[in-house]
Amino acid sequence: MVIGNTRPINIEDEMKNSYMDYAMSVIVSRALPDVRDGLKPVHRRILYAMSDLGMHYNTSYKKSARIVGEVLGKYHPHGDSSVYDAMVRMAQNFSLRYMLVDGQGNFGSVDGDPPAAMRYTEARLTRLAGELLVDIDKDTVEFMPNFDDSLKEPTVLPSRLPVLLMNGASGIAVGMATNIPPHNLTELCDAISYLIDNPECGLEDLMQFVKGPDFPTGGLILGRDGIKSAYATGHGKVVVRARAHVADVAETGARRQIIISELPYQVNKADLVKRIAMLSRERKINGIAEVRDESDRQGLRVVIELKRDGEPQQILNNLYKHTNLQTSFFVNMLALVNNRPVVLNLKEALNHYVAFRQEIITRRSKFELKAARARAHILEGLKIALDNLDAIINLIRHAENADTARRELMSRFELSQLQAQAILDLQLRRLANLERQKILGEYADILKQISYLEDLLANPRKVLSLVKDDLAEVKARYGDARRTEIQSQGVIEFREEDLIPHQSMVVTLTERGFIKRVPTEVYRLQHRAGRGKSIIKTREADSVRFIMVADTHDSVLLFTNRGKIFSIKCHEIPCDLLRTAKGIAIINLVPLAENERITSMIAVSRFDEETSLIMATSGGECKRTKLSDFAAVRSSGLLAMDLPKNDELIGAVIAGADENIILITHNGRSIHFPVADLRVSQRASGGVRGITLEGDDRVAGLDVARPGHFVLVVTTGGYGKLTAVEEYPLQRRAGSGVLTFKVVDKTGKVAAGKVVDREHQVMIATAEGVVIRTPVGTEDQEKGIIVMGRSTQGVIVIRPDENDRVVNFATMVE
């Protein structure tokens, strides 16, 4: 370029060309590893510089600053931090599966702690790293000028190890990126040996040896589909999960604990512990009492102590979903092949390594053959000298000078200049008989070596055999057991229920359609005849209509006055720890039509084929349908029963074919008949007569009447009693029934009736939202509800305020 000469250029072309030059520089000279030695330029330069400084595994450590300075000054004209960071990573046992640098000092931690400054740390090569540099002085690789043309540096290392797959690689170039996982050296050596013997083998054959990635931090890989995809195409997703187990009370001597001993690759342990603690503190994951990091020099150990009611599997499922206890490793096996970025599958990557090692051994053999032939040439001259010793000594003695002696030797004995010079350089002590035998022996050995090397170079199969021998040697010396376990079961997408612990809930629904759930433990047990606790601040003209107890995993079936059924999960109902919270409008959960309201709700744990759903209307109609018909209720609901005019559905229960049911009316009548009296009907059909009602009487409730149980009846005035099921005669359906409660003004009409046993507790709710939780029956009649005959009035079980009334009750088992 001539100074002062101005040449106009197109700015678009210049930017395009400059950016392309930059992109190719990043791709080829910075971000991507070479398929042959698996190294990026910065790693290659660090290892070569350390070898050049003599920092081998059996020498003393030297300051890291010295290494960084050597690399910067000779080979890598970039920032010192880039060189030091790359060297540090090669010394971290949680970053590389097989470390290449042996560091002394603080080289960082799995908690994300930074390493100490380079002036404080020391390093040397590991023994394994020496295998990457073996035979580099035997013309095995090409050298190129360094950045200022003052030195030469290798374009690739003659690595005896398949480093690309052994330690993996990651890097972001321009418009592309690589992310290759590490693998087990033993498996790689076995796979490459098999590939050499069976070059036409398929992916399945290779995967008999290479099971999958083997991360330095261990962990679990879920499923083989992602691995197979990555090995077949070069792209894939591998799901990695932490190794954790649940320690019971006998093991810990305290509460149950989840103990994490291995983390997914590249997960920051300190950040993980903080994340778990935050999720627990914000109540996004319940059941965790404390999180502790107990890691020490013996290994990693994170302890999650559970609360008494914490369910380990649900907590683990939540942690897998919301934290880095489960991560995805996205495989992109991109590497440089002949300085071009190429996505490789497993077989291609292994084949490139085999071809590279063939080239290295061939070049080494040619170098050694050339040296052996040169030495044989010298030894042939020395042999001639030994065979003509007296004549040669006499010739040298009478020669005018060394040049004359050399020329006469070459002329008289037909020697080359090198041979003649070697004879002149021969020490007198080499003329002894023993030394003569050494020269002859060395000559014979050299001839054998030449023959061997010539045969080796003429036979590629023997070169491949040497590749296998090298692999067997490195496998025996450096091979180890797999750290990452591969589980055959793939990733299971967590359903919402998998993340929610089983918990008993009180579900309430008001007349105006506000629904909520509250944990049952919010309500402490009380004696009968108490005033109860308020469970809701009802609005004016609103009151509690239904109350029931359900598990968070139960399906809540909601029945409407029009005979429709809706289904929601209990955990989908908003939960509030405040008893007095009003809840959410039911219309936000199910699409009720105008003037449609919920008239009954039940909780279902399983939708069995053998069980039936028995429904009843206020007018005394009953219907039996298979429960399994309602296992999948669409969001818009289903028609459960075709109702007579001016009738409405008031309740439903689950019963077996050999059981009996009982209907209870507001005026205190009841009928007890077999389920078998009701034929199984289709979902949208109508019902049959269950009980014949008199006057304005309506059905208040129904339940399954099991032997040894009691019929519990509670009135609007707060009166209640227990009556043995056996006191109710078994009748045929459609009769008028028998008396079950003597209704008078002070008791009020029957609000609800259910079948209970001694182990039950009941939660009785009033219209104003007051609830009392009381045992059904104990030996102490002052605490439990009294057992009485059918035609009695019962005793006070709750004292509702004036202008308040009992509306319903729910049963539960402690």
From Swiss-Prot:
NCBIfam families: gyrA, parC_Gneg, PRK05560.1, PRK05561.1. Few gyrases are as efficient as E.coli at forming negative supercoils. Not all organisms have 2 type II topoisomerases; in organisms with a single type II topoisomerase this enzyme also has to decatenate newly replicated chromosomes. A type II topoisomerase that negatively supercoils closed circular double-stranded (ds) DNA in an ATP-dependent manner to modulate DNA topology and maintain chromosomes in an underwound state. Negative supercoiling favors strand separation, and DNA replication, transcription, recombination and repair, all of which involve strand separation. Also able to catalyze the interconversion of other topological isomers of dsDNA rings, including catenanes and knotted rings. Type II topoisomerases break and join 2 DNA strands simultaneously in an ATP-dependent manner. Its main location: cytoplasm. The gene is gyrA. The keyword DNA-binding applies. Heterotetramer, composed of two GyrA and two GyrB chains. In the heterotetramer, GyrA contains the active site tyrosine that forms a transient covalent intermediate with DNA, while GyrB binds cofactors and catalyzes ATP hydrolysis. One of its GO terms (cellular component) is DNA topoisomerase type II (double strand cut, ATP-hydrolyzing) complex. A motif (GyrA-box) lies at residues 526-532. Pfam families: DNA_gyraseA_C, DNA_topoisoIV. The keyword Cytoplasm applies. This is DNA gyrase subunit A. Gene3D superfamilies: 3.30.1360.40, DNA gyrase/topoisomerase IV, subunit A, C-terminal, Topoisomerase II, domain 5, Topoisomerase, domain 3. Residues 32-499 form the Topo IIA-type catalytic domain. It is an enzyme of class 5 (isomerase). It is found in: Cytoplasm.
